[in-house]
């Protein structure tokens, strides 16, 4: 089990967890030293979201990198996918983002990309962790790294998207966008302006403390309300670092990451093409059944966009994502990208010329009940054997009417209990039964 890294980088409450100035400096120094060992380019890219702690954590990271002799290019406040994009474009050894994504402002963290724009694999994360626990290393002969700021860093990313989709996007509807007071603030607006979109922007005034507060992709009620008030045709909601996207149709009804994947699958020619879709263990069974009925290959990965990416590469597919709104298109990028996904959707809606609600999967989705059970410590997968017989009992009762998923959180001591069934009360009753068993045997 990893010591510092979770399923999406390193994350925690600032000053009261791993996320301290001291640790962040050591992380920068460890990665810098590893870059030297492997003879990678002595150059990295950094960015951040809008949290009040982002500045001092970034400079702690930079000091550790500079001490190891690594040059740093600072993009400032930009969405996470922009850092991945620029890391590849500028041939940097690595890319860092100071962000805690959809978490509250008191949390922060570090996402780390390798030179190919992918998140680090488990083996490389272990190497970094070993280096963190070693000595702090100064580059000999005072050959320390430099620090530079790149103004208007978003421009290269916007131009890349525009050159690919200008011929497809001609959307005439009214759009409301929720930037979660995060990294998409002003950046997403610049992208929409480039395409001439008629939009109203909400939650786009970050003050360092309001990121994700009552807004963004994890608080969809905000965009639903705004779409109705504005009589808009579409709502687009991003999270704090803009790697997630949830949309809302003209009736204020949510379309989550699974629904977005289904839209992209129907119009994959506009999105560069794909010979299959990767979802996750959380993907609603209704979508899996729909893909099979339409002869679209479908694979379930573990939850986490890094695992979606691994299976995209493994099976040679191009499009995948999660219910939570991480959507990856390998025809363009290497990580979940809310801004690029939004433009893909606007291209599709422009070409198809029908209401957004008509793109949704027809019929009722399977009903899901998800309960997060707090634990006293992180649970390992082998610990789940203690409730294996209880899970088996529920699966027998469900038969072919549903399924069960128990999943430890990758970032906190929580076990997620999910039951899916064709009836909501059945799903809820069986989920509550399993929660009681978990509390008896694991808490």
UniProtKB/Swiss-Prot annotation:
It comes from the Bacteria. Belongs to the phosphohexose mutase family. Its cofactor is Mg(2+). It catalyses: alpha-D-glucosamine 1-phosphate = D-glucosamine 6-phosphate. NCBIfam families: glmM, PRK10887.1. GO terms for biological process: carbohydrate metabolic process; peptidoglycan biosynthetic process; UDP-N-acetylglucosamine biosynthetic process. Catalyzes the conversion of glucosamine-6-phosphate to glucosamine-1-phosphate. Activated by phosphorylation. HAMAP family: GlmM_B. The active site is at residue 101. The gene is glmM. Mg(2+) binds at residues 101, 239, 241, 243. Its EC number is 5.4.2.10. Keywords: Isomerase, Magnesium, Metal-binding, Phosphoprotein. This is Phosphoglucosamine mutase. Binds 1 Mg(2+) ion per subunit. GO terms for molecular function: magnesium ion binding; phosphoglucosamine mutase activity; phosphomannomutase activity. GO terms for cellular component: cytosol. Pfam families: PGM_PMM_I (PF02878), PGM_PMM_II (PF02879), PGM_PMM_III (PF02880), PGM_PMM_IV (PF00408).
């Amino acid at each position: 089990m990893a010591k510092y890294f979770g399923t999406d980088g390193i994350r925690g409450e600032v000053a009261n967890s791993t996320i301290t100035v001291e640790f962040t400096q050591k992380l920068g120094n460890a990665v810098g030293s590893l870059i030297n060992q492997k003879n990678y380019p002595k150059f990295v890219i950094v960015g951040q979201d809008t949290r009040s702690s982002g500045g001092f954590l970034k400079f702690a990271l930079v000091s550790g990198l500079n001490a190891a002799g690594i040059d740093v290019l600072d993009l400032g406040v930009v969405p996470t996918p922009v850092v991945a994009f620029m890391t590849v474009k500028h041939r940097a050894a690595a890319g860092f983002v100071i962000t805690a994504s959809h978490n509250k402002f008191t949390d922060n963290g570090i996402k780390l990309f390798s030179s190919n724009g992918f998140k680090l694999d488990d083996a490389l994360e272990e190497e970094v962790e070993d280096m963190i626990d070693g000595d702090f290393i100064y580059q000999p002969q005072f050959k320390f790294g430099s620090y530079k700021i790149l103004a208007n860093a978003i421009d290269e990313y916007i131009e890349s998207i525009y050159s690919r989709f200008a011929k497809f996007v001609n959307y005439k509807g009214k759009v409301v966008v929720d930037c979660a007071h995060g990294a998409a603030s002003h950046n997403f607006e610049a992208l929409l302006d480039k395409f001439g979109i008629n939009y109203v922007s909400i939650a786009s005034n970050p003050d360092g403390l309001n990121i994700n507060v009552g807004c963004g992709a994890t608080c969809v009620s905000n965009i639903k309300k705004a779409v109705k008030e504005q009589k808009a045709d579409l709502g687009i909601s991003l999270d704090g670092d803009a790697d997630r996207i949830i949309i809302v149709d003209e009736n204020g009804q949510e379309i989550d990451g699974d629904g977005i994947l289904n839209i992209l699958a129907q119009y994959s020619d506009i999105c560069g093409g794909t010979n299959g879709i990767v979802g996750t263990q959380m993907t609603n069974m209704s979508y899996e059944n729909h893909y099979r009925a339409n002869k679209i290959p479908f694979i379930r990965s573990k939850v986490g966009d890094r695992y979606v990416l691994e299976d995209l590469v493994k099976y040679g597919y191009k499009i995948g994502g999660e219910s939570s709104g991480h959507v990856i298109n390998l025809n363009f990028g290497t990580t979940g990208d809310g801004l690029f996904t939004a433009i893909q959707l606007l291209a599709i809606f422009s070409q198809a010329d029908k209401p957004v609600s008509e793109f949704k999967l027809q019929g009722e989705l399977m009903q899901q009940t998800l309960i997060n059970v707090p634990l006293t410590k992180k649970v390992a997968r082998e610990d789940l054997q203690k409730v294996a017989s209880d899970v088996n009992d529920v699966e027998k009762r469900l038969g072919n009417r549903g399924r069960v998923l128990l999943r430890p959180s990758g970032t906190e001591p929580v076990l997620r209990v999910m039951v899916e069934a064709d009836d909501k009360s059945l799903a809820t009753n069986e989920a509550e039964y399993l929660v009681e068993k978990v509390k008896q045997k694991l808490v």
